[in-house]
């Protein structure tokens, strides 16, 4: 593929044209809207669905996104349906589209998709979490209805990541489907379903930013020339513009590179200021725009220090992170935009500034929201090991290895321009037994650096071994105080590892404990993780103790609670019901924030004054003397029992206020906490003290 290198000199067009920027921007955007030829049509409605074992007449109408496992998998059926589902739709192709180029883009089908146009097989995609695209320009009948058939298969495969996982493998077309219509000469969408544009941040500082815009062009028209323009705006004015005339041979695909030089840039600065420029890349012929693509540009620079942690734009930034699976009650993984928005709103309420989107690429809209809200993101491929289970996460065969590389390239190219993404994750909980994955992970690491030298790689480990010394960053999944041991074990592990390997950039990729909001106890006892009893107060204690250990160790570059939300795992038989991993800080339906949520909110979100009385769901008390606890952003709080003050207590370093040996009277007791000041905050609950505990 022919390439043109970047040279960082201000273009002649730009010199002396600082005046009249607003007028120019208005006219330019008007021109774009007037002449832009690309169309993006959603094809989500009116699909006919049937399983392969059903006859043609058994179809039912569905709209996308859709999964056929929203009921059985979420009911905890370990044998939930894993097989082939057929989706068919009549698509009318307008006669005026003749002479254009047509593409079918799928944002996500799990995990194999075979696509047919008018019953002719046009292609297959293997992998359930990345987007893919097929050109159908010469495969459709213009002025007629065409059949689009997709055979989705979520059956077990030995050559597609992931092989295993502590989550559900929902089947279906669970993300959007698009029909893209472009000019014969276009910015190519065919490069692994990427935008066709890569904004490479080669040098970024408070003084200047040098960005190389790499643009894939595709031409089916006759030989000719076109003008390629790249325009950077800040929302109100043009910051810089570059253009170049390019020669295009018929049938050619070329890569053009244009330099962008921005003086004194406004940086993308996490949650504090998630500012992004907008970059419009457009193609012009004969003075008319024939195609355009717009991408975000969030300029930032960052690094991780083995002793001091993560730095964004030269300033230390403790990463207060969570992990997130992409499913929820009743809909499985077939999420709509409002579901992603609600998840992010809950994270921001809690004070989250980092996220690990586990264990696979998630919806583009989710990455868009991470950009918008300034949440530092760890994005990863679904290279998932067995964890505590008996299956294999790696099979050393060529087809599996190639599939993993394909999914890594898809992840990086499709999401390259998201400023929130700061880490590419390569694996989770692999084991060095049998087929040893070490050499393959080295290949993945080299591929990631080849695709994107600007971002560090990372991984999530749960054991010792050579796997921990491949990626630039390393993090561990730790459950000290849940799967046995105590929270103190985490401190021992971190200190020992940092001392033994001071060169390692150490993070915590998972830590958490299960909790049911229906399981309450007025004494603190560690439960069995595999049992049916998952008391909420143990989860709260677990997070309080683990967070104290983490916060006292600045060398830990980032920590990610497992998990922000309860999620589906059909094989689990524990907690208050089967089929749910209940380690979330919020329930599966997003309706209830657990107590540990408020502990983190008090510690991470100092912008929102709050007080929260813990263990309010524990309404029955059997101990005559109780300990009450509140989480607050205030320096102190006062406790009242039945209107009588039990005294004021100072909040500790971790925003927690505790009153011990509080006596209750038989029957109902009104417990209230309040903060001092002219605008006091209060929280209260009524509990019942019973002298006789049921057997």
Swiss-Prot record:
Displays beta-glucuronidase activity with the artificial substrate p-nitrophenyl-beta-D-glucuronide (PNPG). Is likely capable of scavenging glucuronate from a range of chemically distinct xenobiotic and endobiotic glucuronides present in the gastrointestinal (GI) tract, to be able to utilize these diverse sources of carbon. As part of the GI microbiome, this enzyme would be able to reactivate glucuronide drug conjugates, such reactivated compounds can significantly damage the GI tract. The gene is lacZ_4. Belongs to the glycosyl hydrolase 2 family. A motif (N-K motif) lies at residues 581-583. This is Beta-glucuronidase. InterPro entries: Beta-gal/glucu_dom_sf, DUF4982, Galactose-bd-like_sf, GH2_Domain-Containing, Glyco_hydro_2, Glyco_hydro_2_cat, Glyco_hydro_2_Ig-like, Glyco_hydro_2_N. D-glucuronate binds at residues 428, 477, 483, 562, 583. The active site is at residue 429. It catalyses: a beta-D-glucuronoside + H2O = D-glucuronate + an alcohol. It comes from Bacteroides fragilis (strain ATCC 25285 / DSM 2151 / CCUG 4856 / JCM 11019 / LMG 10263 / NCTC 9343 / Onslow / VPI 2553 / EN-2). Keywords: Glycosidase, Hydrolase. The N-K motif seems to be a discriminant that could be employed as a fingerprint to identify beta-glucuronidases from the large GH2 family of proteins.
